[in-house]
Regions:
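Proteins enriched for Cys/Gly/acidic motifs involved in redox and nucleic-acid/cofactor modification
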Residues: 1-91, 131, 142, 146, ...
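Conserved SAM/AdoMet-binding glycine-rich loop
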Residues: 75-202
């Protein structure tokens, strides 16, 4: 309700003042998992997506603020945290030093030993950094599940979508991660029926 909203948000905040938005969600009653958004917006212009026009370019929550919010969730009793973002693997491109997602995850796991499990939301195959790949092998707390924003398994359709990866890139990532940690399972976002997609294009996705 309007009254409930005003209880948490009583100050006008511009859309891009991401760091000033109060973190009101701190109670997932009777849950062991909580979600922590660390990134918003997107710098890319995929032909099927309106997010950049609705949420603006990518911007990231500073590591110190992520750590503070994470600690609050742990104090509240949560055992598993899912890091989320519109374009999660672009994290840090707008911050000083451009810290990569893998580096941030490594720091969070080091700073918060009480964290039992860490999970990632959907990530872009074109931006997975090498340190993140290595963490799947070295960090047991990083859960063995990865959801990729694949969209299509056909290179022509990917080009028309203005995606930055190819079919071969995705298969390489699958193979590389499985080589580091065989138990990792994968999920994917897939768009079916994209304009000009034929049965042959669709078979390449299957």
């Amino acid at each position: 309700t309007k009254t409930d909203v005003s209880h948490y948000f009583n100050d006008r905040v511009h859309l891009y003042d991401y760091n000033r938005i109060p973190y009101a969600i701190n109670n997932y009653q009777d849950r062991t998992r909580a979600f922590l958004q660390i990134q918003q917006g997107c710098d890319h212009r995929c032909t099927f997506c309106i997010i950049p026009y609705g949420r603006g370019n990518a911007y990231s929550l500073p590591v110190g603020e992520i750590s503070r919010r994470l600690e609050n969730l742990l104090v509240s009793g949560f055992k598993e945290i899912t890091l989320t973002g519109v374009d999660l693997t672009s994290y840090g491109n707008d911050l000083p030093g451009k810290p990569k997602l893998g580096n941030v995850i490594k720091r969070l796991l080091s700073l918060h030993p009480k964290l039992k499990r860490l999970r990632l939301s959907s990530i872009d195959p074109a931006e997975i950094d090498s340190e993140l790949l290595e963490l799947f092998q070295s960090e047991e707390k990083l859960l063995p599940y990865l959801h990729l924003s694949v969209q299509s398994g056909d290179n022509m359709i990917l080009k028309r979508m203005k995606r930055r990866h190819t079919r071969e890139d995705v298969l390489r990532i699958f193979k590389e991660i499985k080589g580091k940690r065989d138990e990792v399972k994968f999920g994917a976002d897939i768009i079916v029926g994209f304009p000009t997609e034929t049965d042959e294009h669709f078979k390449n996705t299957l």
